[in-house]
Curated annotation (Swiss-Prot):
Keyword Signal among UniProt keywords: yes
Species classification: Bacteria, Pseudomonadati, Pseudomonadota, Gammaproteobacteria, Enterobacterales
SUPFAM superfamilies: Bacterial adhesins
Predominant subcellular localization, coarse grouping: secreted
Annotated source species: Escherichia coli
Similarity-based family: Belongs to the fimbrial protein family.
Record-given protein name: PRS fimbrial minor pilin protein
Cystine pairs: C58-C97
InterPro entries assigned to the protein according to its UniProt record, in alphabetical order: Adhesion_dom_fimbrial_sf, Adhesion_dom_sf, Bact_Fimbrial_Adh_Pro
Function text: Fimbriae (also called pili), polar filaments radiating from the surface of the bacterium to a length of 0.5-1.5 micrometers and numbering 100-300 per cell, enable bacteria to colonize the epithelium of specific host organs. Seems to anchor the pilus to the bacterial cell. In addition the stoichiometric relationship between PrsH and PrsA determines the pilus length.
GO cellular component, one term: pilus
PANTHER family reported in the protein's UniProt record: FIMBRIAL SUBUNIT, FIMBRIAL SUBUNIT ELFA-RELATED
Record-level GO BP terms: cell adhesion involved in single-species biofilm formation
Leader sequence segment: 1-22
Keywords from the UniProt entry: Disulfide bond, Fimbrium, Secreted, Signal
Length: 195
């Protein structure tokens, strides 16, 4: 009994030592059928591959990613006499847009949606301004007159070409509180979703 017990232990020890000090198996540049011969390789196997062909999204023109828009100076009397003050135009320019198409015809689902993020003003269609000025908020409208709401997706804009300019208007609007002179600023983010 002792002889049978010690032989297997010795055998496994040799295999372990041999495995530690042996080179790579099979040798580099040689497959198992080459190493053992075709007739000795008997296992079956399967390789599964998968992937996806995608339409890349439009890219934003880098100079439009970070914009500083100077609203200028506005006399308090200009705001006292009306609901809104100065307006400034700005654009988000898209590049390298690819569309759903067949034979050069665009399908109706080639469009984008823009969401502006910022601190909500006194009403959902306005953005809060920081600084010393009081009684005013910021409002954003697209080229079709749709007003942006903080964190809400704006209506879809159909894409018609490889390069698109999404035009918007920023305006200073009264928020119903007492007007006070001073500086103001806001930092707004935006997200472009491509369909």
């Amino acid at each position: 009994m002792r002889l049978r017990f010690s032989v297997p232990l010795f055998f496994f020890g040799c295999v372990f030592v041999h495995g530690v000090f042996a080179g790579p198996f099979p040798p580099p540049g040689m497959s198992l059928p080459e190493y053992w011969g075709e007739e000795h390789v008997w296992w079956d196997g399967r390789a599964t591959f998968h992937g996806e062909v995608v339409r890349p999204a439009c890219t934003l023109a880098m100079e439009d990613a970070w914009q500083i828009i100077d609203m200028g100076e506005t006399p308090v009397r200009d705001l006292q006499n009306g609901f809104s003050g100065p307006e400034r135009k700005f654009s988000l320019r898209l590049r390298n847009c690819e569309f759903n198409s067949q034979g050069g015809n665009l399908f109706s689902d080639s469009r984008i949606r823009v969401t502006f993020d910022g601190v909500r003003g006194e009403t959902p269609d306005k953005f809060n301004l920081s600084g010393q000025a009081k009684g005013i908020n910021l409002q954003i409208a697209d080229a079709r007159g749709n007003i942006a709401r903080a964190g809400k997706v704006m209506p879809a804009i159909p894409l018609t070409g490889n390069e698109e300019a999404l035009d918007y208007t920023l305006r200073i609007v009264r928020n119903g509180k007492k007007l006070e002179a001073g500086n103001y600023f806001a930092v707004l983010g935006f997200r472009v979703d491509y369909e």
